Curated annotation (Swiss-Prot):
InterPro entries: Membr_insert_effic_factor_YidD
First-listed, main subcellular location of the protein, grouped into a coarse class: membrane
Source species: Baumannia cicadellinicola subsp. Homalodisca coagulata
Name of protein: Putative membrane protein insertion efficiency factor
Function recorded in the entry: Could be involved in insertion of integral membrane proteins into the membrane.
């Protein structure tokens, strides 16, 4: 199973990286967090796998809105890290 997931993780990382290099420069920067949501996504997927990584990414994207103060928000080292989502 892990051997099947590794190419998928690489593909997702590639798609996100293409977004960072091609699409992101064309639109107004609006991510309120550091690291950016796309970099957060790559780190989360590599650290926790596809499903947990995508879940953390979705939660992060929902928090990245005009009413959020933003700031530094690193991917947790432990999926059960007690953070406010």
């Amino acid at each position: 199973m892990a051997s099947l997931l590794s190419p998928i993780i690489k593909l997702l990382s590639y798609v996100i990286r293409c977004y960072q290099l091609i699409i992101s420069p064309l639109i107004k920067p609006h991510c309120r967090f550091l690291p950016t949501c796309s970099q957060y996504s790559i780190t989360a997927i590599h650290r926790f796998g596809i499903f947990k990584g995508i879940w953390l990414t979705l939660i992060r994207i929902l928090r990245c809105n005009p009413w959020s103060q933003g700031g530094e928000d690193q991917v947790p080292l432990n999926i059960f890290d007690k953070r406010e989502y």
